[in-house]
Structures are given as structure tokens and as C-alpha cells.
């Protein structure tokens, strides 16, 4: 059997040693790297060859990749690397890795072109100065062959182990049983269309209400698609920590179902084939190798029927009609071609896999069966760096942090132990890391290369420098992306592709910066002040980012890189943070287009004095503000084989298709939920206006409506207002006019303990009204079943405030889509309303009431955005 791996992946495995060292930072962004490569190759002569596809093999290891360039006139192969800072300060182990890659490419080129010798060059391109530094070696073809073979031999055992894992994983996932006795209402349709998306290689928007089991209903078919040869990896992306916990619980449930079936006591009556297989078998030869080192002749056999279930035929699920069914012929998965960047699997030295722990997820899973074979599925939880770092006061290099010292020398043992455990949540990764004295955060990043399901925040795939996106590109993974609570992605993506630069922070950085940074900071401040002098209004929108300001920021970043490489501890954290802010700002300014606006906000007088400006001297805040993240997200969707965005609130579908950059032909599924209109009484208080101008007059009728409802049916209620001020005034009036009503309210800046205390008052048999701001922490993502919550009062349409910034965003949306008001105000506002109202009915047994308090709820354009199953009175 032959195992295929990319040049880069193999060299990162075989040639990395020594310390983890992040002093050579801030590194160029991926966009800067692409631009840098283009500049270097554009300077070469006409005969210069670019992006040369190369392949070769030794023993059972097949290697593929693309060399950056070859100059036939000089007989020189070039490996191009972008950097910023002082090249002489680059860590030796970084340089060794670069040479390893270049020499492997050199051998592959010699073999392909029958060359007797070759000059191999590392071309380092400074993204700030645009200078090239070229290092060369001249080798005979024989010496390059010897180098190549030595790397392959070091990699072979690891690759063979990964092949065995992949074969076992796919075999298990092909017959993975559904973990419940039957599908919930709507869950079958959701699972079927998710599977079709993976099978056909397309995106899907799925609106699915609370109560149908969305997490299991999306993970299960994606895993079956892996087993059937359509996918290599599954990414489960969430907006908040509770979403990660639900995904990990669902994966534990699926593990338990597998173990129960393996032991002859299936966890559920619905079979795997019934739940996720397609009427069309995957084509023979479907690649099961793209994630690294699998046999080149591996194919994806048809999933066998599950004898434990009546519904054993593949057609049992996917022949059901749904709004998301594809009318065209299904796209076949990639066949035959192995990944040019495919990483290999766990070391053959790995300990025997342990049984996965018991877990609770959406329903109590069957306990792990003693002696049952555990599901050969590696699941990894990724968490933020600040939540993983063991030494937050240390710099990330071996001279400062003990967990960075010798990181790559101890990585192999940590990796082998971790991959044998298979379930790699935050606590497990930390335990393994500390046992081997390596950094937990960077161990998790290494484990992402070898994991089958990765659970993490949106930013791990959608951010501009996202880890999972980079790995997917490098390794050419066929990934299935599940985006949980996808209505949150719009605001989160806007944040990812927006950057703020604050002149007050610059002033603080100047006070604390080392002398080596004084000149570039002063130059940046002068250019900034020049911009301030031209500004007449307090808020200004400009067509472009001033080039002089941008150049000054770039030079400051370059100088920071040099100082970081030389003396990283000489830069205080606040100065370093400003440097990273500047780098993010410059990166987005260089990509500025109609998807964003550039605005300048002047701060002066008392506001400036409060921020430390002597005499209230005016300063400003610059912002590259993303409005339409579609332009940045579309390439990420295109890279994935399947992207499924699901949520309880994705209405109207075209709004999310447009703003999130999904293809026009993306099907939309509106899942019928388990709830009946009789469970929820929805009334409109059309005699009240909550508009700003009517705010004072609205207080008394809102309070009387609340008091009347509470007297009619005492219990636990939530009241939602548009602002903390509005909320406070309502609560004060209730306490004044109806002191017998128990009330409590959300405060600004509540910590986790305070939020928990707020929610703790919603208990079975309890009584009272908790007031919160619409769109805040208590308006979504909380689960208060039964009598814990019996009603909600929503005294707002949730429309964003009309101000200069939002009006500029509205204009940008109008220019692109022609529906500026709806896209900026109405649709986002009503999404918050529906999310908040969704707190009331959580199960098929709940009953409750929702009062929509504003005359605008009578309007047709507003009511069409409410859930179909509601009956509005």
C-alpha cells in the first residue's frame, strides 16, 4: 500500500525540533504571504516556472506538493518564505524546516527533469521593505535523493498508523447507529438534507426549531458521510461555549451508541443506514486518503444494512421530500486523488485506545459497554489561548516559558498519548500536555492536524488567519462545516473583518514603549494628527484609508518585529497589543472595498479628558468597519465540500444567503418543529408604541399589561426591553405601582456568577419577572423548561439604534442589495425578537404566552418574519 502526504506536512513531522519560539512575530498574514510570493515571482525572467506540481515516492510513502519556482537558466529551485523583522533573528529550527522542504522539492524536481545537480534556494521576502534575501545550496541529485529517502523513512511508521486509523474509522462510521430509538419530529428531514449536502458537495441553510435535536441531527449525517467516503474532516463551529459543550455531549452519545451496537445492544432503534445513507452509493474509488497517508487504492464501500432495525435500506431516509432536496445530479466526491498536504496519523508507539467516558447529551446515552470496541473517532475541542495558557506572564519561547522549551522534542510522545485517547476535550488535552511538559494550547493546534471532528469557535475557520482554514488549504481536506446558531455569524464575521485603531491607545503606547520604538510611534502620531486637522465633523466617512497614515503604521509594525526578535521582553503588553491592533488594521485597510467603510470618530472635550488627554485635546478613533462579510466568507464556503448553517432563526433566507456569502443556488430547509400553536398564546399590544419619541408614554401601559398577565397566571416571566435605561424605568415603575410583584433585572457588565444568580431565580414553582435587554445574554442560549418560564414580554422590535454609523452601514447595504433598511434594521431586529420569544416553549409539553408590545407588530412585513407555527392574536 502507498501512503500519500504533502511535502510540507511530512517535513513538519520529520524536521521540526527544539523550542516553540514565537519571537519572530508578528508574522505576515496569509494575504501578505500571497502578495509577497507574487511580487517575488513577478521579478523573475520570462523563462521562470511557477507553482510546479511535483510527486515522488519511497517505499510505502508517496509525497506530493508544489515548488514555488524554478529558474532553468540558473538551474535553481526556489522556496519562497515571507517574513517581517530581522532575518538574522529567525530561530534556527524555523530555518531547518525551510531547508528540509526545499531539499525534498529539489529531489522531486531532479527526478522529474532528470537533472544531475541542482541549486536549491531559500528566498526570504520582507513584506515591509520588499527586499529579498537569497540563501543557496548546490547538491547532486544523489545527495538530494538520500535526503528525501531519509525523511520518508522517518515518516513511514506514523503514516502506516494513520492509514490503519482511517480504515477503522470509516468502517465504523459506515454503520454508525442513530443514538435514539426514533427520530424526533423534523429531525429526519434535517439529517437527510445534511447528508445530501455532504454527498453532493454543496451548502445548506437549515432553519430548525428548538426541540428537534439539531446537534445530533447534523453531526450524525456528517459522520456517516465521512464513513461513506465523501468527507475527511468535520468542523463543528459555535458562537459560544455552551454550543461546544452540546457538541461534545452529542459526540459522547454517538460513541455510546456505537459501543452498544458493537456489544449487541444497540443504543437506538433507528439504524445508521436508515438515518444517513443515500439512495445512490458513493462511487468506487472515492478518496479516503485526503487527510493523510491512506492506501491509494482505498475505496468507500456501500454501507451494509443494520440488521437491528427494520429501516435498514439506504432509501429509508433520503428519499423523503424536503425543501432542500437537490434537483440536479449529485456531485461525486473526489476520487483517486490523494491530498498533496495530507498529514499522517498517530505513531505506532501510541498506547492502546481507551474507552470513551460516559456522557449526557440531549438524552441519556447508553452506558459504555465493558469490552465493546470504542468508536475510532478523534474528537478535539479547541479553546482560546487565554483559557489554555499555563504561564500568561511568560513569553512564548524556550528562554521564558518552560512549556515552550523543547516543545518539538517532546511533541511526539504527547501526540501519541493524546491520539490514543480519542476524546480530546480541554481538560484531557491539558492533562496530556502537562504530563509531557508541553504547552496545552499549541499541543491542541498540533492535534488539529490529526483529528476527525474539531469543535471550536467560529473564528477557528472564518477568521482571516484561521488555523482550521489554513490546515484545510495546506492538506486539501474535504471538510464538512457545521455552523451552529448561524444567525450569530453575521455580527461575529463583521467583527472578524473590522479593525479599530485608537489614538488614545497610541498615546499610552508612546509613554511605555522602549526607545527603539519612539521614532516610528511619533511618525504614526504625526500622520494621525494631520488627518485630525482635516476633519471638520465629529464623525467622518472617507473613501480610502490615507496612504501616508498606512505607511507609517506599516513601518511601526516592521520595527516592532525587529525588536521582538531581538529583545521580546523589552516591549510591554499594552505596547505589543497596540502593534497587533495596527497590524490587523493595516491588513484590512489593504483589502478595503465596498464591503466595508472607513470612518474616523473625533473624541474631544470632557470625553477626551476622561481618557487621559491633557486639556481635553481632541484625538480620534479610526475604524475599517466591515458591513458585508460575504466577500470574506464566500471563499471559506467554497473551500469546504459541504457547509451547513443551521439555527432556529434564519428568516428570511435570502438575507443570510446575501450577507454570509453563500452561493445563490444554496437550498434552504425550513424544518417543521414539534410544537403546536395551542402551546403558545401570542398577543400584540397594538395600543403601545416603543419608539424613542413615545418612550415616556409607553411606560404605564407596559407595566399595566405585565401586572394584568401576572395576576391572571402567576409564575416566572422574562421581560425584554431595548436598552438598560428603558429596562430600569420599567422596573422602577413596577416597584412603585405594583410592589407585590417580584422583579429582578439584568445589570451592565454582569460576570458569570451574577448571570448564574439571575437565572437561578427561574425555578420550578417559582414566581416573578426577570427583566433583560433584548439581544443580550438572556435573550438566547438559555433553556428554561416547564414552569421555570411560562411567558415573555417583548417591548421592542429590537431595531438597532439609528445613528451615524448604522446609517452609513445602511447605505452600504442599500448600494449592494437594494434593501438597506430591512438588512440593517428590520431583519436583525426581528431575529432577536424571535430568539427571545423562543425561550418560552422548549419542549412539546411546555405552554406559555408571549406579548409583543408595539403597534408595528400589526404590520404585514413584520408578521411575515414571525415563526409559521405561531397564531398571533
Task: Spell out what each predicted region is.
Residues 164-207, 220:
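Conserved pre-motif I regulatory segment
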Residues 218, 224, 245, 436-453, ...:
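Signature of the SF2 helicase/ATPase Hel1-core->accessory helical subdomain module
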Residues 722-747:
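Conserved helicase motor "Helicase C" RecA-like lobe of SF1/SF2 P-loop NTPases
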